[in-house]
Each structure stands twice: as structure tokens, then as C-alpha cells.
């Protein structure tokens, strides 16, 4: 057993060293494909952490088995969320998903800062689009053990005044399958997206979303929590206004 553990540690170190040769986005994609290969070979248990404290928590009727999950942006196309849950993560947020497929910003768009052990991305909502993402969710959800969040956002070419239509169509697609929906209005990498966080635009958008949710609750007999992604760069005054607008429209959290 000790030999196996040492071998796994050696392979992990070798893999990390090798991946640093590649551009950051390529390394990320290789890592995800390797993870899927390990999962398909039924070897994922060798890499699953047994050290995650199982402190259950309930948020808006979402039952989390622990406090560690995967934020939106890693599994953009809902291809790996079931694998992350098998590693011990309590929730996975897929996306951000747009109505139609889009390629995102030009490469390079993920940048390494090795000294700080950080990555900065400016991907720009690259994804395969709502139809394919929904198919992926239906395909892999039976293998998933956790809370599934779906982050939705407006398409790059959608004008701010029409953005509400994108979000409502995306709610039609994903409301039933999601354990929660995240309304992404905070990404700095999508042109004009943050215009939606102005008080006037946000109030209009969230009013439409709130009305749509009432319809979907009646249709599916299911109350899917809706959270809003706010930018960390907002001023305190703007943040207070945005929270007030969200509470007024029965948004569940941030």
C-alpha cells in the first residue's frame, strides 16, 4: 500500500511538472481529460480525498454534505461535474452557459503567476451553448452525487436592453435540472455585461426573472433557488443598492 501511495505521489509530481510546459489553458484541458480517463478506468478512488470534513450544511433548502465545492468556470460545458462529486466535492456549479455556442475571447486568455501560485482568466463565456450543455447534464446527472448549480449569462452579441430575454430562455432550459441557478452579471470578460449591475438595469432584469420563476414553480412544482453573482469590485454604496433590489425581487442569495 505504501508503494502505491508513493507511486501516485510520484505521478502527481511528474504530471504537474509536465503540464507547466504547456500554456495554461492547454494544461487545464489536458488535466480535465486525464481526470475523465482516470474516472472511466474506475481509478478515481485513488485520488479522492478522505480528509474533507463532512460537516453538513443547509442553505436555502440545499443540503450540502460539506463546505467545499467547485465554483463556476471550471466545468463550463457540464462534462465533468459527476467526476468532481466522486472526488468528494459537495456542489459543482457548471457554466457560465449562454443560449448559443460561443468561442469566448482570443487566446491566450488564461495567465499563470507562478510566484503567487495563481491563475487569471479572461475566457469570456466560451461554451458549447444551452442545448448541448443540457444534453450533457441529462447524460451525467444520474452519476452525480451532490448539489448542481448552473450559471447562466447573456451572449456576447446580445444588447444590454435585450439581455433579460437570454436569461429567461436559459431559465426555461435549466430551471428543472438545476438545484440552483446563478445569474451571472459580474464577469469583466464579457462586453457590456456589467451594465446589467446598474440599479435600473438590474431592477428590470430581476423583476423579469422573478416573474418567470413564479411561472416555473407552477409548471414544475419545484422551487429552484436563484442567486445573483455580484462583482467584488462594486463600491459599498452600489452593493447595498444591488442587494436591496435583489431582496425586493425575492432573489435567494448572492
Residues covered by each model-derived region:
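Short, Lys/Arg-enriched, disordered terminal segments
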Residues: 1-9
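N-terminal amphipathic alpha-helix/helix-capping segment at the start of soluble metabolic enzymes
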Residues: 4-5, 46-70, 132-145
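An N-cap/entry alpha-helix motif that binds or orients negatively charged groups
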Residues: 10-57, 118-126, 130
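Active-site cofactor/substrate anionic-group-binding motifs, chiefly glycine-
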Residues: 63-64, 69, 73, 80-100
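Conserved alpha/beta-domain cores
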Residues: 64, 72-75, 85, 126-253
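Short, conserved acidic/polar surface loops in the N-terminal third of protein domains
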Residues: 80-84, 102-109, 160-163
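A gly/proline- and charged-residue-enriched helix-loop-helix capping module
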Residues: 95-145
Amino acid at each position: 500500500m505504501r508503494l502505491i501511495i508513493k507511486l501516485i505521489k510520484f505521478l502527481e509530481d511528474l504530471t504537474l511538472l509536465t503540464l507547466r510546459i504547456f500554456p495554461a489553458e492547454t494544461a487545464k484541458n489536458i488535466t480535465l481529460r486525464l481526470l475523465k480517463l482516470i474516472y472511466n478506468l474506475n481509478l478515481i478512488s485513488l485520488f479522492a480525498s478522505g480528509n474533507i470534513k463532512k460537516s453538513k450544511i443547509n442553505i436555502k433548502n440545499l443540503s450540502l454534505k460539506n463546505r467545499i465545492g467547485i465554483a463556476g468556470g471550471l466545468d463550463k460545458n457540464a462534462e465533468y461535474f459527476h467526476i468532481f462529486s466522486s472526488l468528494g466535492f459537495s456542489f459543482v456549479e457548471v457554466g457560465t452557459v449562454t443560449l448559443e455556442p460561443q468561442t469566448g475571447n482570443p487566446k491566450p486568455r488564461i495567465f499563470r503567476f507562478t510566484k503567487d501560485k495563481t491563475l487569471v482568466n479572461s475566457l469570456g463565456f466560451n461554451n458549447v451553448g444551452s442545448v448541448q450543455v443540457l444534453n450533457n447534464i441529462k447524460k451525467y446527472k444520474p452519476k452525480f452525487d451532490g448539489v448542481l448549480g448552473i450559471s447562466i449569462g447573456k451572449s456576447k452579441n446580445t444588447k444590454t436592453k435585450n439581455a433579460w430575454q437570454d436569461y429567461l430562455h436559459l431559465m426555461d432550459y435549466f430551471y428543472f435540472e438545476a438545484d440552483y441557478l446563478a445569474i451571472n452579471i459580474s464577469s469583466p470578460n464579457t462586453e457590456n455585461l456589467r451594465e446589467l449591475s446598474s440599479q435600473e438595469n438590474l431592477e428590470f432584469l430581476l423583476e423579469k426573472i422573478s416573474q418567470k420563476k413564479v411561472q416555473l414553480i407552477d409548471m414544475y412544482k419545484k422551487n429552484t433557488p436563484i442567486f445573483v453573482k455580484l462583482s467584488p469590485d462594486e463600491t459599498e454604496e452600489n452593493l447595498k443598492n444591488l442587494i436591496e433590489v435583489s431582496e425586493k425581487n425575492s432573489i435567494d442569495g448572492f
